[in-house]
């Protein structure tokens, strides 16, 4: 079992993608990156001034879905070339970031994945950091799309990501 923390825009969207991946045991929306734990809440993080990032903690069975595939899915389902923005979500809280939990095994895989994308001509701006304090987001953010499937923002953003997942990573789709 491995854990990696990913920030690729709104955590509702990234959460929904990884909930659909075979071998993913748990996806938890949360915040990471800020200095003041008291500001790790949706209202303050949305201000873009706390240093926190909307992220998801992905716990996965790497015998079913290897880290390389988790990263490929992550990079395929968000824009890793735009700093502090994913679509209409603008601000440092939406930046592209990977927090690794094991420097010896995960960091080289992350670096290889990013270098592969750069070799393809992409200007990757994704930040890579060792994991530090993860703050679980408020309960109403957990499993958000499954609880709010008709919410307008989700309807506009999540289905295209799931379509890309289905098309490019069919063998890793759950269910």
UniProtKB/Swiss-Prot annotation:
Gene3D superfamilies named in the record: Peptide methionine sulphoxide reductase MsrA (3.30.1060.10)
Annotated signal sequence range: none
InterPro entries hit by this protein: Met_Sox_Rdtase_MsrA_dom, Met_Sox_Rdtase_MsrA_sf
EC number(s) reported in the record: 1.8.4.11
SUPFAM superfamilies in alphabetical order: Peptide methionine sulfoxide reductase (SSF55068)
Active site: 10
Positions of transmembrane segments: none
Reaction(s) catalysed (UniProt annotation): L-methionyl-[protein] + [thioredoxin]-disulfide + H2O = L-methionyl-(S)-S-oxide-[protein] + [thioredoxin]-dithiol; [thioredoxin]-disulfide + L-methionine + H2O = L-methionine (S)-S-oxide + [thioredoxin]-dithiol
NCBIfam families, per the entry: msrA (TIGR00401)
Function: Has an important function as a repair enzyme for proteins that have been inactivated by oxidation. Catalyzes the reversible oxidation-reduction of methionine sulfoxide in proteins to methionine.
Protein name: Peptide methionine sulfoxide reductase MsrA
Organism: Psychrobacter sp. (strain PRwf-1)
Gene encoding the protein: msrA
């Amino acid at each position: 079992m491995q854990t990696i923390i990913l920030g690729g825009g709104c955590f509702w969207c990234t959460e929904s993608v990884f909930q659909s991946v075979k071998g993913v045991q748990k996806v938890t929306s949360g915040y990471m990156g800020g200095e003041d734990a008291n500001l790790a809440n949706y209202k303050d993080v949305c201000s873009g001034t706390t240093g926190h990032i909307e992220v998801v903690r992905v716990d996965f069975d790497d015998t079913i879905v290897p880290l390389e595939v988790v990263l490929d899915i992550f990079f395929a389902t968000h824009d890793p070339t735009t700093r502090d923005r994913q679509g209409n979500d603008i601000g440092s809280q939406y930046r592209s970031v990977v927090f690794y939990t094991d420097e010896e095994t995960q960091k080289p895989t992350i670096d290889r994945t990013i270098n592969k994308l750069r070799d393809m001509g992409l200007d990757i701006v994704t930040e890579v950091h060792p994991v530090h304090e993860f703050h679980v987001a408020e309960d109403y953010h957990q499993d958000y799309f499954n609880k709010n499937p008709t919410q307008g923002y989700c309807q506009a953003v999540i289905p295209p990501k799931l379509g890309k997942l289905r098309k490019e990573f069919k063998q890793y789709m759950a269910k």
